Amino acid sequence: MSIKGDIGVIGLAVMGQNLILNMNDNGFKVVAYNRTASKVDEFLAGEAKDTNIIGAYSLEDLAAKLEKPRKIMLMVRAGEVVDQFIDALLPHLEAGDIIIDGGNSNYPDTNRRTITLAEKGIRFIGTGVSGGEEGARHGPSIMPGGNEEAWPFVKPILQAISAKTDKDEPCCDWVGKEGAGHFVKMVHNGIEYGDMQLICEAYQFLKDGLGLNYEEMHAIFADWKNTELDSYLIDITADILAYKDADGEPLVEKILDTAGQKGTGKWTGINALDFGIPLTLITEAVFARCVSAFKDQRVAVSQLFNKTITPISDDKKEWIEAVRKALLASKIISYAQGFMLIREASENFEWNINYGATALLWREGCIIRSAFLGNIRDAYEANPGLVFLGSDPYFQNILQSAMADWRKVVAKSIEIGIPMPCMAAAITFLDGYSSEHLPANLLQAQRDYFGAHTYERTDKPRCSFFHTNWTGRGGNTASTTYDV
């Protein structure tokens, strides 16, 4: 009798191939399928040569070569393609079989697929996979959610192939039902946008604001790896700043300053608006990429305003430390806002997400892996009900001690004309969030004046609503809409 596979993988692009090789390295028998049969042959004759990986040349063949309950992972483009493969697979599956979507699917699609497939007896998992090609090959961060009945069957495989912390803890655990895993992956990607933009703002301040050269900036980022800023993105930034082109000049200086995006940052911002969460830093990071895309327009407008940035002549060591503190404090706000969004979704959908465990999922293997994720985990383990990460004593102390330098860097950037949308958004958010009184009383009065939207009074119990006839004309009709 032929040997059956432990899991099947559909999709032999680089991510799919590397996950298959990772599974093989961890002792699992994998059946590989691609819609283009020649890709299967090429893979088996190339990267998968002399392994235990099995090829399949139709979906029927794939299903026949798997142990029951069948476990099939889709590594295909998000969207309609996922639904097409699910529909094509169903005739070859039985009740209890498991489909795993490992792509960057939008969580409402995962919600829908989990429910509709459960009605057909198929258990569905939507899992975020982060870490890129290298992570897929040697250990990614994996964020599974969906039908929890499927988790015991796929847990040994997914945890085996995931990244591990220095304590050998897998960066993979059950996130929650339905689309919880893909939602957490979406927020991860949004935080990634924020982290990258914050680093870029620090880089521009060092380069244009302080007039530092690339060797000096490389040394600074390399030094920051030995601080609380230690992270994958700081690490690769140090490498990038040191990299020379063929002519010996820094390569990054020759890269066109227009940044691309795939849309997950936008998804994060849209969901923040839908849930009413002030995800100000991440949305500014998305908009910064949008601004960068207008290269020709930026060149034209720059000639209208004749902006010249004059480097600061003060003690550069003090400014470098101030930038480090501003970067760290802003990063804390980015993660704080991200976890506020995760909490709101978890409560809204009753996902019961463990926030400390979520931080652990990102500790290794993914793009935002960093040392202080361990501190985030500690904060939520000490206080699972923690609403704002900055309220934890460890993070509160960092924010408080960074405040003066943080303000100094943002103010100076505005003074000399360096755009700093994310650092400015971060400190502005904290100023607003830590204010007992905001000018929203005037705003609500304006709404009541022109739209009879009503207001609450400070001298009356909450949820008691009032309307004023501000002009003495018209009636006392009040809008029924107070909050969005």
UniProtKB/Swiss-Prot annotation:
Keywords: Gluconate utilization, NADP, Oxidoreductase, Pentose shunt. This is 6-phosphogluconate dehydrogenase, decarboxylating. Substrate binds at N104, S130, G131, G132, H188, N189, Y193, K262, R289, R447, H453. Catalyzes the oxidative decarboxylation of 6-phosphogluconate to ribulose 5-phosphate and CO(2), with concomitant reduction of NADP to NADPH. One of its GO terms (biological process) is pentose-phosphate shunt. It is an enzyme of class 1 (oxidoreductase). The lineage of its organism: Bacteria, Pseudomonadati, Pseudomonadota, Gammaproteobacteria, Pasteurellales. The active site is at K185, E192. Homodimer.
